Amino acid sequence: MGSHRDLPAGMVNHIFTNSGISSFTEFVGSYAPDLLPGRNETLAAPVGDRIPHATTIVAATCAGGVVMAGDRRATSGNIISQRDMEKVFRTDDYSCMGIAGTASTGIEMARLYRVELEHYEKMEGRTLSVAGKANRLATMIRGNLGMAMQGLVVVPLFAAYDPEIDGGRIFGYDVGGGPYEQQQYHSIGSGSIFARGSLKKLYRENASPEEVVLTLIHALYDAADDDSATGGPDVTRKIWPVVAQITADGFHRLSDEEVGGHVQTVLQERMSSPDGPVAPLR
């Protein structure tokens, strides 16, 4: 078969609707692989820190669901390239993903993944299971391995509500795919080691969504306190973390007003205790 550019539009539509392929990326890979990101690109040299990188994402389960939050800073080496980048994306009504690593590649992957899930639902008449969604994302990450070896690394964090357990599930990845299911909480990005240490002390099983939101904001604050690539709450510009919660009611991104209220609670507490809440020993 010739190039997709040689086919009339009507034939392309016929192939699309009658291919029987439930994976959008597999369909494009079969008929027009050059349209997939990174498939025909070769860099003369690794890009290193010359392009913006997204940093810290945190997620934790709560009673009846899961919450994910991300800071807003993007860096190019030692330069702050963007102060209000969004790194947490809705992927369908009951799932979301956050990105760390090469920002542009991560954003492109998030958009393509959302189309992937929508395409499956249209072709099959049902949604993928949570494990199926996690595996589809792993396949996309493996597809980016060539670019990752040249420096365009993307490592996402995936979270979803699972009706089978009436609760949230979290999946981490590496550059080769995965997925690796995480229990209770997880963090990725340059500030993840500090955020995870904070979560280890502050996380409480079956806490309310509101309590988990506060826990995640504390974790991002701790990450920003020790990692220069992670942005803390920007009070002067009123730039707050992106926070999303997923329950049986679906995906809900908290408004700036809602997040701002939680941030003020955290900042007030930090004024009297700069290192944050102290976990009880007993």
From Swiss-Prot:
EC nos: 3.4.25.1
Catalyzed reactions: Cleavage of peptide bonds with very broad specificity
Pfam families: Proteasome (PF00227)
UniProt key word Cytoplasm: yes
Entry superkingdom: Bacteria
PROSITE patterns per record: PROTEASOME_BETA_2 (PS51476)
Class of enzymatic activity (EC top level): hydrolase
NCBIfam families: 20S_bact_beta
Assembly information from the UniProt record: The 20S proteasome core is composed of 14 alpha and 14 beta subunits that assemble into four stacked heptameric rings, resulting in a barrel-shaped structure. The two inner rings, each composed of seven catalytic beta subunits, are sandwiched by two outer rings, each composed of seven alpha subunits. The catalytic chamber with the active sites is on the inside of the barrel. Has a gated structure, the ends of the cylinder being occluded by the N-termini of the alpha-subunits. Is capped by the proteasome-associated ATPase, ARC.
Protein name listed in UniProt: Proteasome subunit beta
UniProt organism field: Streptosporangium roseum (strain ATCC 12428 / DSM 43021 / JCM 3005 / KCTC 9067 / NCIMB 10171 / NRRL 2505 / NI 9100)
Species lineage: Bacteria, Bacillati, Actinomycetota, Actinomycetes, Streptosporangiales
Gene name of this polypeptide: prcB
